[in-house]
Swiss-Prot record:
Protein name: 26S proteasome non-ATPase regulatory subunit 1 homolog B
Gene name of the record: RPN2B
Family (UniProt): Belongs to the proteasome subunit S1 family.
GO MF term set: enzyme regulator activity
Regions of compositional bias (Basic and acidic residues) in chain numbering: 854-863
Stretches the record annotates as Disordered: 853-896, 954-1001
Annotated Gene Ontology cellular component terms: extracellular region; nucleus; proteasome complex
PC repeats: 412-447, 452-485, 487-521, 522-555, 557-590, 591-626, 627-659, 661-695, 696-736, 739-771
Positions where N-acetylalanine occurs in the chain: 2
Length: 1001
């Protein structure tokens, strides 16, 4: 109470000058309590307080009191550095558990200071001394967090301060270690900017996981993939595959599918090759495995497995354990090679194809034949719309129209088949046989269709080119025609994506050095595709040639190729990025923007964002500025909500190139999300005054809205109508019309069963998808590169698999209204001669007669009112019957309207599950199958709880659904084609497509 009556600290301050130590101690003790109120007055005596702290004759406690008082005064004065310095001197009197602004502020300052010093100590070779008192404060704070059960806070501080020992302590002491580890993995991906340090954190997490009684092998293998340690993954898979427990084998298959989702092909091949072959087995066992694998459709993986297993002399004693391991190993290798998932995806897209051919027919009819840009755009849209479905009905039905494509349009038309048949690994070459170079170069066919066919082969085998690489190399070597070289280079780059094959590199380099502009551009891009993410020294060789050549096309191809080589290298690419962004040639600087985007792709790194924003507003070249803004989309796709906010001002720029870049940046980073802010930003750009800005905005809007239904966002329906209006408008400029046609294809991509996804479920970059969108964005200069968007397509499917990797039928539930996620309704033909329903004409004489009859009926009813009840009832029923006859149709309509929509939907495996639907997916309680991991989509291994009951399988070899759904009046014409296609088994050897008969130009 006495303290509340004090009006000045003057008396206590005077006591500080007293000679007796006990008086000084008394003064300090009371000033500490009053400092919050009287700090302005106390601040005049700071020198005295400081001298007391420095006086060695004082005992430790008194000096610490003086330090704490000085710290608080400096805090109120805003001198945080001095305040922290004296707080360190206060020792244990600085109580980290106190709940006050002073403590919170200084703790934040201390942690920041400590984190900076720790980072500097690691990053620089110099020895950085850290005040042990600062270390003590941070450690006290960490210990307090762990003691209080604030484990996430402790982990955040430990990661920021690079205290991995404290991080491990926080994880181990937490109540839910598995949940804490998952949180820590997410934090390391989201907030740890430095690649090397992130790897240290992940390595620690792997060690903690492995010490657990029941390790989470799914998470361990994901961490090992981030660390690029294939041997660790192979060891875990071998252990699970050799286990006697069937569930462990299912877990191994699930891990393999999860790794394949990340599309890191070189890593997967390394894991596959490290899996040890079974020990010597009898011939009978080998035959059994081969029979089993033939049923599993993993032909390429199986052949390798059979080759690797040497044929021994017949052993009389069969080792059943090894036989089981051999069978499981074959399945695992088939999954890791990607063939199993590709085959299942192909069958799913084929059997669930819901593409609307009437949309394409409308586009075709509205496009003027002499407008080659829109003609080609229609071919692109068809390929994208049917990507991976193997349905080429539209092309077959319009051969005359298609044959009008000449030169590069012919190249694109043929290459489009590669997108339609993407993943058809077994029959890819036979499908393209009619268009491929026959008997070496100049075999008599059109070089444009031959080049397009080689490009198509690359698209079919993208990232899985083992079986086609040699053929593409031979085709490249045996021709000197630049168009064929162009197609062969692109195809080879796709087939050998990220393999860094020296022989292929030399073949492509020899094409580059011919200095042909057309072939050289493709060669530059192809080199980048081949060397994706290798950060190789060859980049400097490519850069040197880019400076030597005079062809802009070659420089641009090389600039993009160099950018591809530094994919995912983060700070390791800074030297090359600096070199490219400072170059005098704007095309090299343009490549530097892509290098910056790809090196930091998906990291949301602040340094990269700052650099890109700087170039977006300061570079003298419009191309560089446009690309700098576009590149933001690649850096930010892991945090799509940020992109519209960051580029919102740029989308209102006076420069149309910057506006275009802003549109595509949003399209890339928010693809498939249906994000409301993204749509709001793009809407005004779709009606921009500049044609190419409208084009970019329409394409970006389609990318954002893919797999979003009109029921979940009404703007989707409005956008579809806007596209139709632009396409049908004869006065619309070509650029906008092309954008609208492409947008129509992207909206309904892959038979309306795919979305664009750049991150896998485990937050790993999908390499192929990111590279695909990067090269797709080059269509500004070269339209055939539009097809690269197909690499970013990811099926929106739940595909449950049993132990035999077959798809059993079982039901699960979507706890949401079916209309929210249903397919778009098929378009209908608008008939002009539909008779409008008009009111019936009534003559005046008829009206008078009806009125008179009604009046007589009323009088008669009154007269008979006293009559018997039966007669009354009959009259009433007759009247009711008459009324019901008149309003029969109306009543039926009302009944239909009244019926409420179901609040859930039963789905059958395999089912279409769009990203926004995943949170509503629930399994039935009495289900026969239980998933190995709770995943609402993708490939999910199922444990059979009733293995003795017979199974009903889905996705059989010959899907019963029609390959090309007929729409409206086209049904009769398509029936025969559809029946033929549906009867054809995907795995059977199909007849090659009919050759397109092009009219000679």
């Amino acid at each position: 109470m006495a303290a509340a009556m004090v009006s000045s600290a003057g008396g206590l301050l005077a006591m500080l000058n007293e000679p007796h130590p006990s008086l000084k101690l008394h003064a300090l003790s009371y000033l500490i309590r009053l400092v919050d109120q009287f700090w302005p007055e106390i601040s005049t005596s700071v020198p005295i307080i400081e001298s007391l702290y420095e006086d060695e004759e004082f005992d430790q406690h008194q000096r610490q009191l003086a330090a704490l008082l000085a710290s608080k005064v400096f805090y109120y004065l805003g001198e945080l550095n001095d305040s922290l310095s004296y707080a360190l001197g206060a020792g244990s009197l600085f109580d980290v558990s106190e709940d006050s602004d002073y403590i919170h502020t200084l703790l934040s300052k201390a942690i920041d200071e400590y984190a900076i010093l720790r980072s500097k100590a690691v990053e620089s070779s110099e020895v950085v001394e850290i005040d042990p008192r600062l270390v003590a404060i941070v450690e006290r704070m960490l210990d307090k967090c762990i003691t209080d059960g604030k484990y996430q806070q402790a982990m955040g501080i430990a990661i920021e301060c690079r205290r991995l020992d404290k991080l491990e302590e926080a994880i181990i002491k937490s109540e839910n270690v598995q949940g804490t580890l998952s949180y820590c993995i997410n934090v390391s991906h989201s907030f740890v900017n430095q690649r090397e340090y992130r790897h240290e954190v992940l390595r620690l997490l792997v060690n903690v996981y492995q010490k657990l009684a029941s390790p989470d092998y799914l998470s361990i293998c994901q961490c090992l993939m981030f660390l690029d340690e294939p041997q660790g993954v192979a060891s875990i898979l071998e252990k699970l595959l050799r286990s006697e427990n069937k569930d462990d084998a299912l877990l191994a298959f699930q891990i393999s599918f999860d790794l394949v989702q990340n599309e890191h092909q070189a890593f997967l091949m390394s894991v596959r090759d490290r899996l040890p072959a079974p020990k010597t087995r009898p011939v009978e066992a080998i035959q059994a495995v081969e029979t089993s694998t033939a049923q599993n459709e993993n032909t390429a993986g199986d052949v390798q497995m059979a080759d690797e297993t040497p044929s021994q002399t017949i052993v009389h004693e069969t080792d059943p354990v090894d036989a089981v391991y051999a069978e499981r190993l074959t399945k695992a290798k088939g999954i890791l090679s990607g063939e199993t998932s590709i085959q299942l995806t192909l069958q799913f897209l084929y059997s669930h194809n819901k593409s609307d051919l009437l949309i394409l027919k409308t586009i075709k009819q509205s496009v003027e034949m002499r407008n080659s840009v829109c003609h080609s755009a229609t071919i692109y849209a068809n390929a994208i719309m049917h990507a991976g479905t193997t349905v080429d009905t539209f092309l077959r039905e319009n051969l005359d129209w298609l044959s009008r494509a000449t030169n590069w349009a012919k190249f694109s038309a043929t290459a489009g088949l590669g997108v339609i048949h993407r993943g058809h690994l077994q029959q890819g070459r036979s499908l393209m046989a009619p268009y491929l170079p026959q008997g070496g170069a100049g075999g008599g066919g059109s070089p444009y269709s031959e080049g397009g066919a080689l490009y198509a082969l690359g698209l079919i085998h993208a990232n899985h080119g083992e079986g086609i690489k040699q053929f593409l190399r031979d085709s490249l070597r045996s021709t000197s025609v630049e168009v064929i070289q162009h197609g062969a280079c692109l195809g080879l780059g796709l087939a050998a994506l990220g393999t860094a094959d020296e022989d292929i590199y030399d073949d492509i380099k020899s094409v580059l050095y011919t200095d042909s502009a057309v072939a050289g551009e493709a060669a530059g891009i192809s080199m980048g595709l081949l060397l994706v993410g290798t950060a190789t020294d060859k980049a400097s060789e490519m850069l040197a040639y880019a400076h030597e050549t005079q062809h802009e096309k070659i420089i641009r191809g090389l600039a993009l190729g160099i950018a591809l080589t530094v994919y995912g290298r983060e700070e390791g690419a800074d030297t090359l990025i600096e070199q490219m962004t400072r170059d005098q040639d704007p095309i090299i600087r343009y490549g530097g923007m892509y290098a910056l985007a790809l090196a930091y792709s998906g990291t949301a790194n602040n340094k990269a964002i700052r650099q890109l924003l700087h170039f977006a507003v300061s570079d003298v070249s419009d191309d560089v500025r446009r690309t700098a803004v576009l590149a933001l989309g690649f850096v930010l796709y892991s945090d799509p909500e940020q992109t519209p906010r960051i580029v919102s001002l740029l989308s209102e720029s006076y420069n149309p190139h910057v506006r275009y870049g802003a549109a595509l940046a949003v399209g890339i980073s928010c693809a498939g999300t249906g994000l409301s802010e993204a749509i709001s930003l793009l809407e005004p750009l779709t009606s921009d005054v500049v044609d190419f800005v409208r084009q970019g905005a329409l394409i970006a809007m389609a990318m954002v809205m893919v797999q979003i239904s009109e029921a979940s966002d009404s703007r989707v329906g409005a956008f579809r109508r806007q596209l139709e209006k632009i396409i049908l408008d004869k006065h619309e400029d070509t650029m906008s019309k092309m954008g609208a046609i492409l947008a129509s294809g992207i909206l309904d991509a892959g038979g309306r069963n795919v979305t664009i996804r750049l991150l896998s479920k485990t937050k790993h970059d999908k390499v192929t998808a990111v590279i695909g969108l990067t090269v797709f964005s080059q269509f500004w200069y070269w339209y055939p590169l539009i097809y690269f968007i197909s690499l970013a397509f990811s099926p929106t499917a739940f595909i449950g698999l049993n132990y035999d990797l077959k798809v059993p039928k079982f039901e699960f539930m979507s706890h949401a209204k079916p209309s929210l996620f249903e397919y778009p309704k098929p378009t209908t033909v608008a008939t002009a001669n539909t008779a409008a329903k008009l009111p019936t004409a009534v003559l005046s004489t008829s009206a008078k007669a009806k009125a008179k009859a009604k009046k007589e009926a009323e009088q008669k009813a009154k007269a008979e009112n006293s009559g018997n009840e039966a007669g009354k009832a009959n009259a009433a029923s007759d009247e009711k019957e008459a009324e019901s006859m008149q309003v029969d149709s109306t009543a039926t309509t009302v009944e239909k309207k009244v019926e409420p929509e179901a609040t859930f939907e039963i789905l059958v495996n395999p089912a279409r599950v769009v990203p926004s639907q995943e949170k509503y997916i629930k399994l039935m309680e009495d289900s026969r199958y239980v998933p190995m991991k709770l995943a609402p989509s993708g490939f999910v291994l199922l444990r059979d709880l009733r293995p003795h009951e017979p199974e009903v399988l889905s996705l059989t070899d010959a899907p019963t659904s029609t390959a090309s759904p007929a729409v409206g009046a086209e049904a009769a014409g398509q029936a025969q084609q559809a029946a033929t296609t549906s009867a054809m088994a995907i795995d059977d050897e199909p007849q090659p497509p009919q050759a397109f008969e092009y009219a000679s130009p």
